[in-house]
Amino acid sequence: MQLSTTPTLEGFTITEYCGVVTGEAILGANIFRDFFAGVRDIVGGRSGAYEKELRKARLIAFKELEEQAKELGANAVVGIDIDYETVGKDSSMLMVTVSGTAVKVSR
């Protein structure tokens, strides 16, 4: 499955638009508590543990997006947008959302 943030895929022709697809993942409050309590993990202004959790959430969201596209018979998703939102009481959770257009492409 081809995944792209661009509206087209170089070298491919979009033959059919199958529909909008999305994927979501939510990081619970514990990651934030661990993040802020574990400031010692920050090296050079970055937290390896926090980045690992964000990467995991992104992978989950992309997997959902790809599964939806396959269900629609698509072999690619174009125009992918990745968003991060804080949700929940006191913005204690982080939601990763990906969306795009499922398409069928050919060379």
Curated annotation (Swiss-Prot):
It comes from the Bacteria. This is UPF0145 protein Spro_1658. It comes from Serratia proteamaculans (strain 568). Belongs to the UPF0145 family. InterPro entries: UPF0145_dom_sf, UPF0145_YbjQ-like. PANTHER family: UPF0145 PROTEIN YBJQ. NCBIfam families: PRK02877.1 (NF002776). It holds the Pfam family YbjQ_1.
